[in-house]
Structure formats: structure tokens, C-alpha cells
């Protein structure tokens, strides 16, 4: 084994298995691209994104860790969100929650 080497088992991994998910239609109403990372609390994303924010409270994008989704100006796309795990406490981001969900 080489230091830092990862040995993966054969087969496929299912991301976020068994966690609640929702699907939302999101539109970028601004004039600049908006990029949202994999672990960003979707409820607190840029105000230029138009979608059902209350439905997104406690959810993040259902994509691989370290990746992101980019919304071009005027673009509308459908995204899948997955429930945040762990203690379900949210701090930082845009400061809209600052505590337990």
C-alpha cells in the first residue's frame, strides 16, 4: 500500500442511500452565473435563484461531494436535493438558520 492510497471494493456505490430527497425546478433570474456546491444548504443559496425555498430548507444538492451545479443567467433546470444528515444544525452560509432545523 502507498501512503494515502485508497483501495475500493469492486462494484458501484449508491450516494445518499435511504435519505429523503425532493425535486425542485430552479431558475437563475440574475445576469451572472451562480454555482452551488455539493454541501451548501440549498435554502440559503443566492437570492438570484428562484425556487420553493421553504421546501428546500434542510436539503442540499444530491450530487457527489466536492462537485457543484452551475446555473447560467436565465437558465431553468430541475435539481434533486437530499436531506442534510447528522445533527441537522445549520450555521453560516447566509445566516438564515443559525441553529437546528
Curated annotation (Swiss-Prot):
Recorded catalytic activity of this chain's protein: urea + 2 H2O + H(+) = hydrogencarbonate + 2 NH4(+)
EC class of the enzyme, as a word: hydrolase
Keywords for the protein's UniProt record, in alphabetical order: Cytoplasm, Hydrolase
Assembly and interaction partners: Heterotrimer of UreA (gamma), UreB (beta) and UreC (alpha) subunits. Three heterotrimers associate to form the active enzyme.
Coiled coil spans: none
Assigned GO CC terms: urease complex
EC number of this enzyme: 3.5.1.5
Pathway as given in its UniProt record: Nitrogen metabolism; urea degradation; CO(2) and NH(3) from urea (urease route): step 1/1
Subcellular localization(s) per the UniProt record: Cytoplasm
InterPro entries found in the cross-reference section: Urease_beta-like, Urease_betasu_sf, Urease_subunit
Protein name: Urease subunit beta
Amino acid at each position: 500500500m502507498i501512503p494515502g492510497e485508497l483501495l475500493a471494493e469492486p462494484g458501484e456505490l449508491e450516494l445518499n442511500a435511504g435519505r429523503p430527497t425532493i425535486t425542485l425546478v430552479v431558475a437563475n433570474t440574475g445576469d451572472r452565473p451562480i454555482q452551488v456546491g455539493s454541501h451548501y444548504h440549498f435554502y440559503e443559496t443566492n437570492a438570484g435563484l428562484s425556487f420553493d425555498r421553504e421546501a428546500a430548507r434542510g436539503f442540499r444538492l444530491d450530487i457527489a461531494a466536492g462537485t457543484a451545479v452551475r446555473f447560467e443567467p436565465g437558465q431553468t433546470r430541475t435539481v434533486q436535493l437530499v436531506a442534510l444528515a447528522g445533527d441537522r444544525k445549520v450555521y453560516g452560509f447566509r445566516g438564515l438558520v443559525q441553529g437546528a432545523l
